[in-house]
């Protein structure tokens, strides 16, 4: 039933868009019986007024207010992604200045990921309760305060507190940007829009650590937070001046604060435990206890949301759930969310494992490691853009099959590394992998959200981003532990000793890559079997398009 409603809505909305683009404006001065003048970009009232789709997307193009607003949101979200990764290059300098251990210093990056993971489930309520301007301006004020605090902090605790505020400020921005794109663009143009946004987002991991290291070397780590403070102030001013509201909100909506608490302890506890699993044993109080609390909290959270939703649908209750999990009843959305989560789980570990191979086992510098991995990040940015355009033209199914297959081939190819491999083979395989990731991740996410009703997109965005955050947080530590297990077994088989340590470690990395490849292969199967229905498309469409292109060139 969910798919049939989505199919009908897909056609109805396209008709609505065509109708809205040919309708005479309300204040059209043309009083005669002649054909009305084409719709033009027209004033849409004060900045606090909600910009509806007929005003934001006119004659197949963004109106000026919508373009400015989307640019501001994309820039702010980019800053959030950039901030998350920028500090990794400055950790040695911070550790030296405050005389702390590397493990403690790592919390500057861990707490950012942890807080962002906690914030994402709350975005569904926030977008329901507050307007776009209220959310964005408040978030950037919090971000700016956090950046200033870290810049001026006399001790590590205040630097960490500033990072926490930065994460709170930026944690909601990606879901807000997704929801805004879906409220502006019609169904058959969302792939291109999300691909363009994904292009901007993918640049952040490519340049974040590099620019962070360069700025730290030139002017010290505090200059990074000074720069972010200035960017925060500029972003607040830009949002106040140029940002419009999108989508409807209910100022009277009430939050279920007990669900908020369950969400924080559930998702936060689970991610906290997995973050520590590389530093402590599984049964240690810093890992096992938070993970147990997290699992119990998530189970309680899910049961409470389902119970409230059922009571509301049955007319026996009026209180809304904090997060509408009914979206998981939609087959297309669930398939897309599972696919994206598997991709994050399998992909995140490689970003941890391969630098170990390049630096520890092959003896290359950290700078060289970054250069080897850099082409892949740029490839993913380009692939997300073209993947979005292909989604609009051919549908999600052929694009996702292509992407997941390329990702699988690249992963198994990378598993062929050895102690004497050409080092740029890693770069080539990572480039292939991230090309595949770009072609599968954004199209499958866009398609899965397209399967939902308009009023379910905010909940769907929160659910899918939460699942991806958890999968990413779990993937790296789980596969690193698997690598260490294979390494220990191989080291013992080789008789132990320092001279065989590197060979044993490479053996462990090879098997982790093979396991990751099997997960990618599972993703191919899920896409082939599960991605169906309106908007999914077929491989025949690509074939017909290619044949038409060949015939036109031969004439």
Q: Where does each model-flagged region fall?
A:
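Hydrophobic alpha-helical interface/terminus motif in multipass membrane transporters
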Residues: 91-94, 180-181, 215, 243, ...
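Cytoplasmic-side transmembrane-helix entry/capping segments in multi-pass membrane proteins
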Residues: 190-200, 252-261, 287, 397-400
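12-transmembrane solute porter fold
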Residues: 66-82, 87-91, 99-124, 131-136, ...
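Intrinsic disorder in cytosolic terminal tails and internal cytosolic loops
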Residues: 1-65, 530-555
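Peri-membrane helix termini and adjoining interfacial loops of integral membrane proteins
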Residues: 45-50, 314-315, 488-498
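Short, membrane-exposed interhelical loops at transmembrane-helix boundaries
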Residues: 494-508
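Hydrophobic transmembrane-helix bundles of small-molecule transporters
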Residues: 217-338, 364, 372, 512, ...
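Transmembrane-helix bundle of Major Facilitator Superfamily
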Residues: 2-3, 31-241, 394, 406, ...
């Amino acid at each position: 039933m969910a798919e049939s409603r989505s199919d009908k809505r897909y056609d109805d909305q396209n008709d609505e868009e065509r109708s809205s683009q040919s309708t005479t404006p309300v204040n059209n001065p043309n009083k005669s019986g002649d054909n009305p003048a084409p719709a033009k970009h027209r004033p849409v009232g004060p900045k606090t007024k909600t910009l509806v789709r007929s005003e934001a997307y006119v004659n197949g193009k963004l109106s000026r207010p919508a373009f400015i607003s989307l640019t501001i949101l994309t820039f702010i979200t980019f800053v959030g992604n950039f901030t998350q990764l920028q500090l990794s290059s400055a950790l040695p300098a911070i550790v030296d200045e405050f005389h702390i251990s590397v493990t403690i210093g790592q919390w500057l990056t861990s707490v950012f990921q942890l807080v962002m993971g906690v914030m994402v489930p709350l975005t569904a309520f926030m977008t329901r309760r507050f307007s776009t301007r209220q959310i964005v301006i408040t978030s950037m004020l919090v971000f700016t305060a956090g950046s200033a605090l870290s810049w001026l902090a006399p001790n590590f605790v205040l630097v960490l507190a500033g990072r926490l505020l930065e994460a709170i400020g930026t944690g909601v921005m990606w879901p807000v940007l997704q929801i805004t794109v879906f409220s502006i663009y019609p169904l058959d143009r969302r792939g291109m829009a999300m691909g363009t946004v994904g292009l901007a987002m993918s640049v952040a991991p490519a340049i974040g650590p590099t620019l962070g290291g360069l700025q730290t070397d030139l002017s010290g780590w505090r200059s990074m937070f000074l720069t972010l403070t200035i960017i925060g102030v500029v972003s607040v001013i830009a949002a106040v001046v140029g940002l419009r509201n999108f989508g409807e909100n209910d100022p009277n909506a009430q939050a279920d604060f007990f669900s908020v608490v369950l969400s924080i302890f559930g998702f936060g506890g689970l991610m906290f435990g997995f973050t520590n699993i590389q530093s402590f044993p599984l049964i240690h109080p810093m890992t096992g206890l938070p993970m147990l609390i997290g699992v119990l909290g998530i189970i309680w959270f899910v049961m409470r949301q389902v119970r409230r939703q059922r009571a509301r649908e049955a007319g026996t209750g009026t209180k809304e759930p904090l997060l509408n999990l009914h979206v998981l009843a939609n087959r297309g959305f669930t398939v897309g969310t599972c696919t994206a989560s598997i991709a994050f789980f399998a992909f995140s570990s490689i970003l941890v494992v391969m630098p170990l191979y390049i630096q520890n086992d092959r003896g290359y510098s950290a700078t060289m490691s970054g250069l080897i991995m850099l082409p892949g990040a740029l490839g993913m940015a380009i692939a997300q853009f073209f993947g979005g355009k292909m989604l609009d033209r051919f549908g999600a199914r052929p694009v996702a099959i292509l992407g997941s297959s390329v990702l699988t081939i690249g992963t198994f190819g990378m598993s062929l590394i050895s102690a004497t491999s050409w080092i740029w083979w890693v770069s080539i395989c990572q480039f292939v992998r991230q090309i595949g990731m770009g072609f599968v991740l954004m199209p499958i996410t866009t398609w899965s959200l397209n399967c939902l009703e308009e009023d379910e997109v905010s909940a769907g965005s929160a659910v899918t981003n939460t699942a991806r955050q958890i999968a990413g947080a779990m993937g790296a530590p789980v596969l690193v532990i698997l690598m260490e297990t294979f390494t220990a077994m191989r080291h013992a088989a080789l008789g132990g000793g320092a001279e065989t340590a590197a060979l044993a470690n490479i053996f462990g990395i090879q098997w982790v890559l093979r396991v990751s490849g099997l997960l990618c292969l599972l993703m191919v199967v899920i896409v082939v079997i599960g991605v169906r229905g309106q908007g999914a498309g077929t491989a025949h469409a690509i074939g017909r398009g290619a044949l038409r292109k060949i015939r036109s060139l031969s004439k």
